[in-house]
Amino acid sequence: AVVQFVPVFRQTQAEARAGDRATPDTATIQFVAPLAVLIGVSLVTGVFSGLFYWLYPVHAAAGAVAVYRARNVFRRDFKDVSVLAVAVGVITFMLWIAMVPHDDGQSADFAEALYAAPTWLAAIWLLFRVIGSVVVVPIAEELAFRGFMQYFLAKTVAPHAGAHAASGVAILATGIGFALVHASVAAAFVAGIAYGLVYSYRNRLGDAIVAHAITNLLIAIYVLMLERWSYW
C-alpha cells in the first residue's frame, strides 16, 4: 500500500510490541503521528478550500488512516471504560454549549453553502464530518495531549514535586496546550482539564477518548438537529 512508504504511517515490529504496553516511552510516533497528520493535512487542504471546507473528507480520511496505524497503543484501553468518562463527556458538552455563543451569521453562511451543493455531496460531507468529529479527532487529540504530553509532563515533574503535584501540573499545562489548538480557547481549556482528570483518575487513555468522543457526539447531534452550524 502507498501509506507503507510514508514514514509517519509505517509501524515497525518494535513499535507494534511497544504498542502492547501503550506508553510513549518506546512508541512515541504512535502517539503524536495522528494529530500531526490531521494538522498537516488541514494546512494543505485549507489552501485549496474556499469559505466552505469541502475537502474535510480528505482531512478525516487521512486522520483515520493514521489513527488506525496507531491502534495498538489505545485499543486495549476500551475493555473497561468507566461510567465517569461518559458522565464527564456529557457535562463537558453542556459546558461547551454554555460557554461558546452560537453565531447566527456563521451558521447562515454554512447552511447556504451546504444546501447549495448536490444532495449526495452534502450527505457525504456530513457523514465524514460526523465520523471525523466523533471518532478520528478524539482519538488523535487524546493520544497526543493526554497519552503523550500529560504522561511525559507528569513523569518529568514527579521526581521534583511528588506524584500528586506533578499530575496537577501536567493536567493544567496539557489543558493550556489543548486550548491553544482550538478556536474556542476558554471552552477548550475547560474540556482539556476535564479529559485530563478523567485520564489521570485511572491512568486509562480509553476513558479520556470516550469522554472526548461523547462530547463531540452530543455536539454533532446538537448541530444537526438544530442546525447550529457555527459549532462546527
Walk through the language-model features, giving the residues of each.
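Transmembrane helix-loop-helix hairpins at the membrane interface
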Residues: 1, 121-232
